């Protein structure tokens, strides 16, 4: 079957939730038995978000094949079973750099390179490539209609719709329908102007998703349909909800999936949302709660740890618990002391880069170890736990990471200079390597030690988890730390790189070099997070 396309755009304001809406629609279509993928097209000039500040852009989501991508791809994977790859996210920077590379190589035979057709052709080519083999491809365009940056992307999608045929394409536009308290009514004019903006570049939306803090009244939906040239049944009301996992059912209740299947002439089963109903039941009926302290350096923007936040919620679903996350700036631990860590049921230190706040994280790991507080360290969270143990248990005073102190006597964490990737190829890095795209990225095998807590949680000898880091445990100094009692319970496929450490004689202290949050989903959870939240609950009862 030829691929059908749903192009998702946004209007009026940003941050309306295009990614959540696209993922929710994909979840319904998948529940109807269709093979669905989702792509995100980002108009910014960065080649990828890998070197962007988390406080500006939010987290960098790492795919199975090692792409550093937009956090929306995390939403996609949490809503559907399809695994995202490098083909599912590209930026204007990536498009332009590829076109310029081809021009330098002589691929265009001396032609004058222009936005149309060369940039738009490259965009179309990547969309078609990413959609190949799927029944439905949902393509989300970042930004807001009217932005200069997004014009080449919208023009490319307009052309693609003409080329593949309008019977195989749907334009779905998210727009804001604000409620004005003084008038006591919702206002449709911003939506009308947003559609007018789309029409000015040759795109007639087929579906309007109207975001508001309440359901849009039928008379206002009819008004929007009339003035925006859209069937009334294709004007969908998407109100604010307490949980994003309610949205698939909300869209289905208004017949959005029926409209799309009829438009594409797809003969498929009714959507079975029983898995999502179970998720919502677990979420609405907790049997208790826990408070997890997340100690990091980007705590002013929770989206910087989006996948970790969601993974903790998923672990709450697994354990029928409400997980309350208390964000703690690691610099506050340095200045205010460890008292701010009291009354926490569990402590989590997520990944991060740079020296700022590191000593606060080391203090936090020490507090968790010495006070028997369940601890989960991720990436840098494992490295600070290793440094802390080396300093205070192994007696290696001044132990540190060469990332933070290149002249320290005991660089227990050091730059990876050579390792094997998933295909068995040797990757080499040095201090002179570029920051962008030079880390150990993507899914890597990890071999677990039998009898360890990690082995017990995973129930497997070999696991596969995603990585994003440059620094590793220094194998030259590692034996001294292990001799002091620290357990290395997970190793890379070649048995050279430390993947998991555990502190013995502690209720629950596990730290991993990889990022387990990237593979956690609301329907399946993740064994590490589930075990951590369970341990936190048991600690709360003491």
Swiss-Prot record:
Annotated function: Catalyzes the ATP-dependent amination of UTP to CTP with either L-glutamine or ammonia as the source of nitrogen. Regulates intracellular CTP levels through interactions with the four ribonucleotide triphosphates.
Native organism: Histophilus somni (strain 129Pt)
Name under which the protein is recorded: CTP synthase
PROSITE patterns according to UniProt: GATASE_TYPE_1 (PS51273)
Residues annotated to bind L-glutamine: 352, 380-383, 403, 470
Active site: 379, 515, 517
Residues the entry annotates as binding ATP: 15-20, 72, 239-241
Involved pathway(s): Pyrimidine metabolism; CTP biosynthesis via de novo pathway; CTP from UDP: step 2/2
Note: CTPSs have evolved a hybrid strategy for distinguishing between UTP and CTP. The overlapping regions of the product feedback inhibitory and substrate sites recognize a common feature in both compounds, the triphosphate moiety. To differentiate isosteric substrate and product pyrimidine rings, an additional pocket far from the expected kinase/ligase catalytic site, specifically recognizes the cytosine and ribose portions of the product inhibitor.
Record GO biological process: 'de novo' CTP biosynthetic process; pyrimidine nucleobase biosynthetic process
């Amino acid at each position: 079957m030829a691929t059908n396309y749903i192009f998702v755009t946004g209007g009026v304001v940003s941050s309306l939730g295009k990614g959540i809406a696209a993922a929710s629609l994909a979840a319904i279509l998948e529940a109807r038995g269709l093979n669905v993928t989702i792509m995100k097209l980002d108009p910014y000039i960065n080649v990828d978000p890998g070197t962007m500040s988390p406080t500006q852009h939010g987290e960098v989501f790492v795919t199975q094949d090692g792409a550093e991508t937009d956090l929306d791809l995390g939403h996609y994977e949490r809503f559907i079973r399809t695994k995202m790859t490098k083909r599912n996210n590209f930026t204007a920077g990536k498009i332009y750099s590829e076109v310029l590379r081809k021009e330098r190589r002589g691929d265009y035979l001396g032609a004058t390179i222009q936005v149309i057709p060369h940039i738009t052709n490259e965009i179309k080519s990547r969309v078609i490539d990413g959609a190949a083999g799927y029944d439905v491809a949902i393509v989300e365009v970042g930004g807001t209609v009217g932005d200069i940056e997004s014009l080449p992307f919208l023009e490319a999608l307009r052309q693609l719709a003409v080329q593949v045929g309008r019977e195989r394409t749907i334009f779905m536009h998210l727009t804001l329908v604000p409620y004005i308290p003084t008038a006591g009514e919702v206002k449709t004019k911003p939506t009308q102007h947003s559609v007018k903006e789309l029409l000015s570049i040759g795109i007639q939306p087929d579906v309007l998703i109207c975001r508001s803090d309440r359901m849009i009244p039928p008379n206002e939906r009819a008004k929007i349909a009339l003035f925006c040239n859209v069937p009334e049944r294709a004007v969908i009301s998407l109100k604010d909800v307490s949980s994003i996992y309610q949205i698939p059912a909300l869209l289905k209740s208004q017949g959005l999936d029926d409209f799309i299947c009829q438009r594409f002439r797809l003969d498929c089963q009714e959507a079975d949302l029983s898995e999502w109903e179970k998720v919502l039941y677990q979420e609405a009926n907790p049997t208790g709660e826990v408070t997890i302290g997340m100690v990091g350096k980007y705590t002013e923007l929770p989206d910087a740890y989006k996948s970790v936040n969601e993974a903790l919620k998923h672990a709450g679903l697994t354990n029928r618990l409400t997980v309350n996350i208390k964000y703690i700036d690691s610099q506050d631990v340095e200045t205010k002391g460890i008292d701010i860590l009291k009354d926490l049921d569990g402590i989590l230190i997520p990944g991060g880069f740079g020296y700022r706040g590191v000593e606060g994280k080391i203090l936090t790991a020490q507090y968790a170890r010495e006070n028997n507080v369940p601890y989960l360290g991720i990436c840098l969270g494992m490295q600070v736990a290793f440094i802390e143990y080396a300093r205070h248990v192994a007696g290696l005073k001044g132990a540190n990471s060469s990332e933070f102190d290149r002249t320290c006597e005991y660089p227990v964490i050091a730059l990876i200079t050579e390792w094997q990737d998933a295909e068995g190829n040797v990757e080499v890095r040095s201090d002179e390597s570029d920051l962008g795209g030079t880390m150990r990225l993507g899914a890597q095998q990890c071999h677990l030690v039998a009898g360890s807590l990690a082995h017990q949680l995973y129930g497997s000898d070999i696991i596969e988890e995603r990585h994003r880091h440059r620094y590793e445990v220094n194998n030259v100094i590692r034996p001294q730390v292990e001799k002091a009692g620290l357990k290395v319970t997970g190793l890379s496929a070649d048995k050279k790189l430390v993947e998991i450490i555990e502190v013995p004689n502690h209720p629950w202290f596990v730290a991993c070099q990889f990022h387990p949050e990237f593979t956690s989903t609301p329907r399946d959870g993740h064994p590490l997070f589930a075990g951590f939240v369970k341990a936190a609950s048991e600690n709360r009862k003491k």
